[in-house]
Amino acid sequence: MAMSNTSALASKLLPSCKPHQPTLTFFSPSTTCQKKPRSSRPISAAVHVTQPPKTPISSATATKRRLSLLNGVWESWKSKKALQLPEYPDEGKLDGVLKTIEAFPPLVFAGEARSLEEKLAQAAMGNAFLLQGGDCAESFKELMPLYSRYFQNTASDECRLTFGGQCPVIKVGRMAGQFAKPRLDPFEEKDGLWLSGANGWPVAWEAYCKLQQLSPSRALLLVVCCYAESHPMDLDFVEHSEQGDRYQELAHRVDEALGFMDACGLTVDHPIMATTEFWTSHECLLLPYEQALTREDSTSGLFYDCSAHMLWVGERTRQLDGAHVEFLRGVANPLGIKVSQKMDPNELVNLIEILNPTNKPGRITVIVRMGAENMRVKLPHLIRAVRGAGQIVTWVCDPMHGNTIKAPCGLKTRAFDAILAEVRAFYDVHEQEGTLPGTECVGGSRTITYDDRQTRYHTHCDPRLNASQSLELAFIIAERLRKEESVLNAHSP
């Protein structure tokens, strides 16, 4: 399974005395052991609006409905209007490439996607915390160096969230597939070459290869690498950061906890302590590519898009009658919906109904991106609409994309204070609405300032957080989780 780099922190649910409130269980991402909850509060991380499912549906009925649905939409997306798809100049070459991809083994397996959906269902019920992150857009030529840095950043964020927030963390990376991005302009100029502005590396292939002096055969060797086991990590980068002392304090507390576990016979050599789980995700944009990697699962008979464990539909492609929504309703992967201040509450309810007609927990994650001011005004209406429809979703805040501005040099940047303001607004709104939230971020390992942006701006789309900012955000969220936990425990009988 692939790796993520920084944080997409989801949210958690306030305790409720309603009869449908589930019994709480700890689920560790890398083990099946269970612990008795410390109190009546849910532990962590995805905001689940506290309403029961609209219509209780048995597993057999849900499977039958899903099979019927899949058989009807496997090819039907081609008859719908598809925005943001490039105009391929040579359909013959395109067909040849798609047939080659169809013959490839899957990048992920259906069972893995099902496992992620189960974990996201725990997040939707308030029993886990979603940590999602990665570059806005990937490049074929630097995957391996980036993955190493992302893994270090994610490990430090996860450590702070798990130990500081006392909750299991689900780690999902925006990687091993986030090569294509929708753009406002169909073409853009780069070093004298006019490239497709819509879809990046997979579309402007020959021009990019010419520009970067990188042969397609070499680039293909770098497309994806999946890891299922963690390795020792070098976290020296925190020693000289503003958060270094806080992180070292946390490390000492973790060491004390490990000492206690060792005394109880659970050492760091135990398989539970030596492995971890990472999941991949990307935007479902290039539909011919996505269909070429879609496979029927022999176990369930369902279709899974095996290009990633989780897919999402973007702000520019989420039309109810569009090709992207039509395709996504036909695959059984966990799905995300990107939502801005433009989203109408009723439209969101209808979109969730289309993508998750059986109201299955873990199927839908709503990723909100609209800036701090819009968050306080628009988000309450979205939460109330979804809650009123009785829909089970995981709410996530993406504070990056709503805070992109242009620096004087013309390059894009994001003010960290604006990012923090949106995160705080997201938490405040959910607290106001009776739920408690989290965040998604795109992060990296380089500090980018106005002064050195021209020489250190290596991202292929929008700017990243650096490692220090990513860690700082994790500290802020974990400390808020701990504070809220203390308040809830103080009021527990």
Curated annotation (Swiss-Prot):
Annotated pathway: Metabolic intermediate biosynthesis; chorismate biosynthesis; chorismate from D-erythrose 4-phosphate and phosphoenolpyruvate: step 1/7
Protein's recorded name: Probable phospho-2-dehydro-3-deoxyheptonate aldolase, chloroplastic
Organism: Catharanthus roseus (Madagascar periwinkle)
Coiled coil: none
Taxonomic lineage: Eukaryota, Viridiplantae, Streptophyta, Embryophyta, Tracheophyta
Subcellular location: Plastid, Chloroplast
GO CC aspect terms: chloroplast
Disulphide bond pairs: none
Listed GO MF terms: 3-deoxy-7-phosphoheptulonate synthase activity
Listed EC numbers: 2.5.1.54
Listed GO biological process terms: amino acid biosynthetic process; aromatic amino acid family biosynthetic process; chorismate biosynthetic process
Catalysed reactions, as listed in the record: D-erythrose 4-phosphate + phosphoenolpyruvate + H2O = 7-phospho-2-dehydro-3-deoxy-D-arabino-heptonate + phosphate
